[in-house]
Amino acid sequence: MKPYKAPGPDGLYAGFFQRFWLIMGDSMIREVERVFTTKKVPNFLHKTLIVLIPKIQDPETLGNYRPISLCNTVYNIITKLIVTQIRSHLDNIISPYQIAFISRRRGTDNIVIAQELIHSMGRAKERTGYMAIKIDLEKAYDKIEWAFIREMLIEFNFPDNIVYLIMSCVSSVSTSLLFNEGCLESFLPSRGIRQGDPLSPYLFILSMEYLGYLIEEKCEAKLWSPIKASRSGPAFSLFFLRMTFSFLLRQIKIIAMP
């Protein structure tokens, strides 16, 4: 962990624990072990501060800011340990069309595939239309439902103890907004994951994988049809760049005019 990254509500940097590990190490280890034993994160570790970071030079609306969550150092250690447990399984879960946070995968691969698919759509001579949908997931972290996260983790066969622990991390958050060098009154969110939480990127790509799984179900049921860049090539229905792309064979025949 970076020693002097912005601290959470407790005001303690990771560097503080690193410097005084001989004094505080045993207490921290006991607390982390207790969380993994009980599968529950205590409320005092759940407290989070939100700071608004401008996305552009001169922000004018709330949409021009990115909310970053400042979590307590001990909480970050817990979620990093959870990430260590689930990261080794991601290669077996995440499709090859997702590249974020997965080792040995390159974003340039998907860029090339997208270009080839769009090129093939442009030169297609069939009398059937094609459709490419670019989905910009605005405020995606804020809009993920907790029930969806639980359903997704169960569907991917994560062990019950990991599911309980992740849901405890996600759904028991007390948040306060930093504003004008002070903290506003805390509130309890009812959905979403935190930007700045080490666990959040992995929950997000798993959620996107579940979306892809649902689309594949539609394709297998012949309700949607994926497309191919060539007759003998693989079929594509969904993959990911910075945005989400969905490639479909449009089920509307083009009628020739007399």
Model features per residue range: what roles?
Residues M1-P258:
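Nucleotidyl polymerases of mobile genetic elements and RNA viruses
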